[in-house]
């Protein structure tokens, strides 16, 4: 299980280091192989490869005549990019993924059980505050 919020830094090449507390699990369950894709909230979703493959199988079986399904398939499968942790626990994010999520130097990695969300740090704080305000209303 992946849980918790961690501030992370992207280096000049677009690599982000996965926090050490998650690395052993990712090496065990996925041999350090991950898949990143986009989310409607303009963040990235990062799954261990075996979990992503199960999601992808389900996505491609959905009825493609449904407009919402096609949009979801185009975004999630279309942007899906395999990542591999290097010896330092870093993964290289493509320029397209970084631009989609507005990732520059500082980011937030949010554990979501079976996956991570990777957010532009300012966008994360804004959305978090909006969600908290919604709960108060």
Where are the language model's segments positioned?
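Flexible "stalk/tail and boundary" regions
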Residues: 1-6, 12-13, 22-83, 87-88, ...
């Amino acid at each position: 299980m992946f849980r918790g919020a961690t501030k992370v830094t992207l280096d000049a090449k677009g690599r982000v280091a996965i926090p050490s507390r998650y690395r052993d699990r990712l090496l065990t369950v996925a041999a350090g192989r991950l898949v990143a894709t986009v989310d409607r909230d303009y963040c990235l979703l990062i799954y261990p490869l075996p979990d992503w493959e199960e999601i992808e199988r389900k996505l491609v079986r959905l009825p493609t005549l449904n407009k919402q399904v096609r949009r979801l398939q185009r975004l999630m499968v279309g942007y899906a990019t395999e990542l591999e942790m290097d010896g330092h626990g870093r993964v290289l994010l493509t320029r397209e993924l970084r631009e989609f999520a507005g990732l520059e130097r500082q980011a937030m990695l949010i554990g979501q059980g079976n996956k991570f969300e990777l957010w532009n740090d300012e966008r994360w704080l804004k959305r978090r505050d909006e969600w908290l305000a919604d709960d108060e209303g």
